[in-house]
């Protein structure tokens, strides 16, 4: 049996993950379709130029950050994942809360149990300078 990590090791790993996310400019998100709740990591807030945890994100508000010409594509990817369990990997323009246009790579992966999507999780990466 593997030993469990100490609280200090867990705290160190969490801090390292936060630092790596900031360095790579990549954030994570998770959506619970049953509760209709969306969670963003600190870095997603930073990518969209909001103070971390200053707003409670929703799917609708998240899609609203994409450039107008990209919103239908993002909404379709979400709907297809929720209804058919299909993952996506897209590069789309996004308009931050401060009005700056950037490009992001957004990846979504559904968790399907008994043919039903019970959770979506993924990443948002600012690829503007890449």
Regions found by a protein language model. Give the residues of each.
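PAS/PAS-like sensory domains
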Residues: 21-27, 72, 80-90
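PAS and PAS-like sensory/regulatory domains
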Residues: 26, 88-90, 97, 102-106, ...
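Short acidic/glycine-rich beta-turn/loop cap or linker motifs at sensory/regulatory domain boundaries
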Residues: 29-39
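PAS-family sensory domains
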Residues: 31, 81, 93-99, 111-113
């Amino acid at each position: 049996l593997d030993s469990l990590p100490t609280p200090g090791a867990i705290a160190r790993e969490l801090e390292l993950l936060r630092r790596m996310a900031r360095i790579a400019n990549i954030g994570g998100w998770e959506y619970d379709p049953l509760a209709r709740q969306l969670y963003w990591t600190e870095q997603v807030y930073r990518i969209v130029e909001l103070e971390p945890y200053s707003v409670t994100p929703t799917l609708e508000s998240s899609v609203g950050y994409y450039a107008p010409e990209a919103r239908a594509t993002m909404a379709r990817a979400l709907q297809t994942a929720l209804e058919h369990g299909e993952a996506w990997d897209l590069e789309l323009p996004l308009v931050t809360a401060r009005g700056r246009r950037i490009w992001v790579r957004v990846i979504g992966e559904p968790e399907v149990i008994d043919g039903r999507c019970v959770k979506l999780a993924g990443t948002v990466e600012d690829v503007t300078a890449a």
